[in-house]
């Protein structure tokens, strides 16, 4: 998300892409879904109805985590209002994700009006299980640094194979960063929660009786194959 009023243009999309690559390269057990505004048609009002539709579809299917990087405010994501407080209040999905919002003011909980981020957490029929979110204006470079550090801490396994708690992930993230931008990020939710990370790994050891090596396997159409593996 970028606009003509600032110099960010594609910066937010590039930052989001970097986060997706981190998951794909380091935590391949998780699937990433990316929603690019410009991959969809923009209507006459200046917004992207199909982006809103796609976000809604993904949330209904169930997501571990939803991350937005870009412009925003207390009631909406982006200058194009692709996801708004009204959308949040009207949602009916039941599988609640963790929300990460690297955008300005999304959860300004000390304002007289209820913010969109608060609506995510207070929503009785939908919303989110927890939020790593913002209470004030934040800057793009600082958001990117915090987002990357947060991902490293959220998805890193402890010695017992479990993920860190959300509170520990936020604590370690802020501890490793300097500057004041981090002070505008908060965790809303139970700090003792952990992401739903598989405690074990599945490893393929052989295909058609042949041990796994650096040599590629060749399969024919409709061929039946036997895959062997182990749980680590």
Show which residues each predicted segment covers.
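Cysteine-dependent hydrolase recognition
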Residues: 1-232
């Amino acid at each position: 998300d970028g606009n003509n009023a600032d110099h960010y243009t594609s910066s937010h999309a590039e930052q989001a892409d970097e986060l997706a690559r981190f998951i794909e390269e380091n935590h391949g057990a998780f699937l990433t879904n990316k929603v690019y505004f410009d991959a969809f048609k923009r209507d006459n009002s200046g917004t992207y109805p199909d982006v809103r539709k796609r976000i809604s579809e993904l949330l209904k299917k169930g997501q571990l985590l939803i991350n937005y990087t870009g412009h925003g405010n207390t009631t909406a994501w982006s200058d194009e209002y692709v996801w708004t407080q009204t959308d949040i209040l009207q949602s009916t999905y039941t599988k609640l994700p963790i929300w990460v919002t690297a955008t300005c003011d999304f959860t300004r909980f000390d304002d007289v009006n209820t913010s969109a981020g608060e609506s995510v957490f207070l929503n009785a029929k939908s919303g989110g299980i927890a939020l790593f979110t913002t209470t004030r204006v934040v800057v793009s470079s600082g958001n990117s640094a915090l987002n990357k550090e947060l991902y490293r801490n959220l998805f890193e396994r402890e010695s017992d194979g479990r993920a860190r708690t959300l509170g520990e992930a936020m604590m370690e993230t802020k501890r490793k960063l300097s500057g004041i931008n981090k002070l505008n990020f908060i965790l809303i939710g139970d700090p003792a929660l952990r992401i739903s990370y598989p405690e074990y790994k599945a490893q393929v050891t052989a295909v058609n009786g042949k041990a796994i090596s650096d040599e590629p396997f060749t399969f024919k159409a409709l061929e039946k194959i036997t895959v062997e593996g182990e749980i680590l």
